[in-house]
Design a protein with these regions (language model features):
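N-terminal single-pass transmembrane signal-anchor helix
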Residues: 1-25
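Short, contiguous, well-ordered secondary-structure segments
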Residues: 9-12, 30, 51
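Aliphatic-rich helix starts adjacent to a transmembrane/signal segment
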Residues: 16-40
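N-terminal pilin/flagellin-like segments and related low-complexity appendage regions
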Residues: 23, 28, 48-53, 57, ...
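N-terminal alpha-helical signal peptides/signal-anchor transmembrane segments
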Residues: 35-59
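Extracellular/periplasmic head regions of type IV pilus-like filament subunits
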Residues: 54-107
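Short, surface-exposed interaction loops/tails
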Residues: 90-145
Length: 145
């Protein structure tokens, strides 16, 4: 009878390990898909702004923000932007894996970076000599043009 209890314990432990492993992989795939989707939204937002500014060049000089109606895309809570210094700054809160997804989808664009202590850092962590608008918070991923 003792061997039967040991057998059941081994089967239960193995099953628990397998289930936990599968759950972890599933969570990882879900996070990766979420990052890919957010990166696509980020890029779509930047492209819509650039398309709008190509047709309305006076807005690049005037600066400010554009509405989702002006851009012709659905609004998003995860991506923000501002037009300042005749540049477009688009940013999103940094989450694990988002930078990697953006680098992949943007072909490792040199215009991609992160903001730390009010300074723009490139993807390698080097400070860039670009003055950021004060509305851009720390700990965000930023793409500019």
């Amino acid at each position: 009878m003792g061997w039967f209890i040991v057998f059941i314990m081994v089967i239960t432990t193995t099953g628990n390990f397998w289930f936990t492993s599968q759950l972890s992989r599933s969570e990882h795939r879900h996070q990766a898909a979420e990052n890919t989707q957010q990166a696509a939204t980020f890029i779509r937002y930047m492209n819509a702004i650039n398309d709008y500014l190509h047709q309305h060049q006076e807005r690049r000089t005037a600066g400010g923000r554009l509405t989702s109606a002006q851009l012709g895309i659905p609004g998003t809570d995860t991506v923000s932007h501002i037009i300042s210094q005749q540049r477009v700054f688009v940013w999103a809160t940094e989450t694990p894996g988002l930078m990697a997804a953006l680098r992949e989808q943007s072909n490792d664009s040199a215009l991609l970076g992160r903001v730390e202590n009010g300074r723009l850092l490139d993807t390698a962590g080097r400070a860039l000599s670009i003055t950021l608008p004060s509305v851009i918070p720390d700990h965000v991923i930023l793409w500019m043009n």
